[in-house]
Design a protein with these regions (language model features):
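Small/polar residue-rich beta-strand/coil "junction" motifs that cap repeat-based extracellular fibers
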Residues: 10-11, 21-24, 38, 74-133
Length: 133
């Protein structure tokens, strides 16, 4: 733990950001006020959090939760294994969901939101219906 007020727990874990926390083997929290929890998780964006094995939160104010999830856009959120939120202010919710455009939301397993200011509940060739609305 090299950052001021930081904590690192686990073999080869590192908490170099000020007020950061890294918990798990190889976990790394280098962003200020960041938290990485889980084997090989990374929280490098300031005020970011990554939880789950291999999760990564590199954008400022980003949150990645789930094994292999990635939140690289500023203010992005990825929840679910292998989910990815790379657009600014984007959210990917569900296993393998991808929100790559700015201000986009991908909802559900395998959903893709690749247009700005959009909400997707499926992907090309894997369309879904909204019911009981």
């Amino acid at each position: 733990a090299g950052g001021t007020g930081s904590t690192a727990i686990g073999a080869a874990s590192s908490a170099s950001g000020d007020q950061s926390a890294a918990v798990g083997v190889g976990a790394s929290a280098s962003g200020a006020n960041s938290a990485a929890i889980g084997d090989s998780s990374t929280a490098s964006g300031d005020f970011s959090s990554a939880s789950g094995s291999g999760s990564s939160a590199t954008g400022s104010f980003a949150t990645a939760s789930g094994a292999g999830s990635t939140a690289s856009g500023e203010n992005s959120t990825a929840v679910g294994s292998l989910s990815e939120a790379s657009g600014t202010n984007s959210s990917a919710l569900g296993n393998g969901a991808v929100a790559s455009a700015n201000d986009s939301v991908a909802l559900g397993n395998g959903s893709v939101a690749d247009r700005a200011n959009s909400v997707s509940v499926g992907s090309a060739g894997n369309e879904r219906q909204l019911t009981n609305v």
